[in-house]
């Protein structure tokens, strides 16, 4: 079982677990298993890589999939590869708060700068955001306040699907005070949105 530490820690120690989630870590590991003959057993070895969130939306899953397919194509790896999607954090938050998302903008701050947040919020009633943690929540609050979007409501889904899950309804100012680390997915509601012209 491979994946980020937080993804694999809950699973039994009866199976081999490695905190690998990047292609650069996983490919050498799989190639070594194959070299050691472990994959040549009568019953094929099954290796699972866990990713959080949506497998098709700013996920490391795509990069790993491409790398695995390339390794199979050149004969470096004898494997079958398939993706089994989970439930995205956007879908989870939308369900928790009874909101649709077919008419929402969906953006990611996960590991990158988001320069167009205020213009997107100005032109959409609903904006869902994937974040990297509390620092991004503070940035959201700062960007909204700086753009004069202080009437917006920020619904922060904290640790969705984990036992400590909570839904927090915040003002931009309250966002700037968030310090609790963890996984956040946000929904920003703008009561004064105007469609783009």
Please provide the spans of the model-predicted regions.
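Class I S-adenosyl-L-methionine
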Residues: 1-81
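General beta-strand structural signal in soluble alpha/beta enzymes
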Residues: 2-4, 49-51, 81-86, 106-108, ...
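Short, charged, surface-exposed secondary-structure boundary motifs
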Residues: 9-13, 25-31, 91-94, 113-118, ...
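Short beta->alpha connector loops
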Residues: 20-24, 87, 109-113, 133-135
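Predominant activation on well-ordered alpha-helical scaffold segments within soluble catalytic domains
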Residues: 27, 31, 62-65, 91-95, ...
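Short, surface-exposed amphipathic charged segments that create phosphate/polyanion-binding patches used
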Residues: 30-37, 42, 96-99, 118-124, ...
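A contiguous loop/helix-start segment that scaffolds small-molecule binding in enzyme catalytic cores
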Residues: 47, 123-197
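Class I SAM-dependent methyltransferase SAM-binding "motif I" and its flanking Rossmann-like core
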Residues: 53-124
